[in-house]
């Protein structure tokens, strides 16, 4: 049989068209495919087809991103207002309720309080899963062993946070919590190869400045109380006591000591949890369920060992005249923790991470103001200035992290294009 020889004449190839698309090459490819030695052409065709599929997938992904951006821009205001308000209300409510619970006269059973809150939180999450509102992993012993160190760190975080709230005003507590962000950022630099941008560093200076202003205002108020012989805060119970019962140094230092420990514990908790999440693959509700469930026995054991379970201690911590209301507030605070987790996830899902960061930064202002409104914290130039500077530092930090995320995303996109 005579072999097929393609014609050497062909139409003019348009400028920019690959020679692969010419008539001669296509005919040659057909000939190679029909001959025993045409395997190379088949491989070439397969490679080209795979490249086309990859390009189509990248185009679809890019179209999806652009569509999501357009939907987010065109999203009605009423759609985003509700999750933002829910997150803000949950944060304020949780802080105010916890401050109310631990501010009772001579309240010393903090571990028992936290155990009750964790139990209520687990019950609410389990009930929400049963009725189909949320979903998370079932109990697994291997997951529990891997996550137990994280839960132990969480116990330290919530205990030191409660003690800080017991001795510090809400504005001072809220402002000093910003220092945790600095510790976490430099922890990521050391252990995860992160970096701090100049704008992020500027926000850190503002955070430190707001903390110094808040501490100066708080110490000035305490010194003025001491000089006037007015009641001050007892470092053991957190209650107001006469001047003669307490020393000046204890008054000023104990709250800041608890706050410093809380910042260290919070940073360690976040950094260690980041490592463990990679091992366990936990989602938000998984970590919340295991955190609270595993912390219950730890809190209960510490309560039995450290705290006084005598009848006199119970009547002092849970006075009979307000016992029902106090226990209801404790249970409510446990349920509020679930509400915070849900509203946070809702806000991120509907509004995006950027909006959530800005809302979280601005939300420090009403949280700090709630202490002035509900607990009579002093309104003076120092407190107001510290709150405003702290709010600005949070906004600058949110903008810095957003810009950093955009730069990293563009680098990843360029890296993907170069590989393709």
Swiss-Prot record:
It is found in: Golgi apparatus membrane; Cytoplasmic vesicle membrane; Endoplasmic reticulum membrane. The chain crosses the membrane at residues 77-97, 107-127, 146-168, 172-194, 201-223, 252-272, 294-314, 324-344, 356-376, 379-399. It is a multi-pass membrane protein. InterPro entries: SCL35B1-4/HUT1, TPT_transporter. Pfam families: UAA. Residues 1-76, 128-145, 195-200, 273-293, 345-355, 400-420 are cytoplasmic. GO terms for cellular component: cytoplasmic vesicle membrane; endoplasmic reticulum membrane; Golgi apparatus; Golgi membrane. Residues 1-11 have a biased composition (Polar residues). Residues 98-106, 169-171, 224-251, 315-323, 377-378 are lumenal. Keywords: Cytoplasmic vesicle, Endoplasmic reticulum, Golgi apparatus, Membrane, Sugar transport, Transmembrane, Transmembrane helix, Transport. GO terms for biological process: GDP-mannose transmembrane transport. Residues 1-21 are annotated as: Disordered. It comes from the Eukaryota. GO terms for molecular function: antiporter activity; GDP-mannose transmembrane transporter activity. Involved in the import of GDP-mannose from the cytoplasm into the Golgi lumen. Belongs to the TPT transporter family. SLC35D subfamily. Homooligomer. This is GDP-mannose transporter 2. The lineage of its organism: Eukaryota, Fungi, Dikarya, Basidiomycota, Agaricomycotina. The gene is GMT2.
């Amino acid at each position: 049989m005579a072999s097929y020889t393609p014609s050497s004449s062909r139409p003019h190839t348009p400028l920019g068209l690959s020679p692969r698309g010419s008539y001669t090459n296509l005919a040659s490819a057909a000939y190679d495919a029909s001959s025993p030695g045409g395997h190379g052409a088949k491989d070439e065709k397969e490679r080209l087809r795979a490249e086309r599929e990859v390009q189509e997938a990248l185009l679809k992904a890019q179209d999806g991103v652009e569509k999501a951006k357009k939907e987010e821009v065109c999203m009605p205001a009423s759609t985003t207002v509700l999750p933002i308000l829910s997150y803000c209300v949950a944060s304020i409510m949780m802080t105010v309720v916890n401050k109310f619970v631990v501010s009772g006269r001579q309240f010393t059973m903090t571990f028992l309080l936290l155990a009750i809150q964790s139990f209520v939180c687990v019950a609410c999450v389990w009930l929400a899963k049963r009725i189909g509102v949320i979903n998370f992993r079932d109990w697994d012993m291997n997951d529990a062993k891997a996550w137990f160190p994280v839960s132990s760190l969480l116990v330290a975080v919530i205990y030191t946070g409660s003690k800080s709230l017991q001795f510090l005003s809400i504005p001072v507590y809220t402002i000093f919590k910003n220092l945790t962000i600095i510790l976490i950022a430099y922890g990521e630099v050391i252990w995860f190869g992160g970096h701090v941008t100049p704008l992020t560093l500027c926000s850190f200076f503002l955070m430190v400045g707001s903390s110094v202003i808040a501490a100066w205002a708080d110490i000035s108020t305490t010194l003025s109380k001491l000089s006037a012989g007015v009641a001050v805060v007892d470092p053991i119970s957190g209650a107001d006591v006469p001047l003669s019962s307490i020393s000046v140094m204890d008054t000023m230092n104990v709250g800041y000591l608890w706050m410093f420990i809380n910042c260290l514990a919070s940073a360690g908790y976040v950094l260690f949890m980041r490592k463990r999440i990679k091992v366990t693959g936990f989602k938000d509700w998984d970590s919340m369920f295991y955190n609270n469930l595993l912390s219950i026995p730890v809190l209960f054991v510490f309560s039995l060992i450290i705290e006084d379970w005598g009848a006199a201690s119970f009547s002092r911590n849970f006075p009979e005249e307000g016992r029902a209301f106090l226990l209801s507030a404790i249970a409510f605070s446990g349920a509020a923790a679930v509400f915070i987790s849900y509203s946070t996830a809702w806000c991120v899902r509907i509004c995006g991470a950027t909006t959530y960061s800005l809302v979280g930064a601005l939300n420090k202002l009403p949280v700090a103001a709630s202490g002035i409104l509900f607990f009579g914290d002093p309104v003076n130039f120092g407190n107001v200035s510290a709150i405003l500077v702290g709010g600005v530092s949070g906004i600058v930090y949110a903008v810095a992290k957003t810009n950093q995320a955009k730069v990293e995303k563009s680098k990843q996109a360029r890296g993907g294009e170069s590989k393709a």
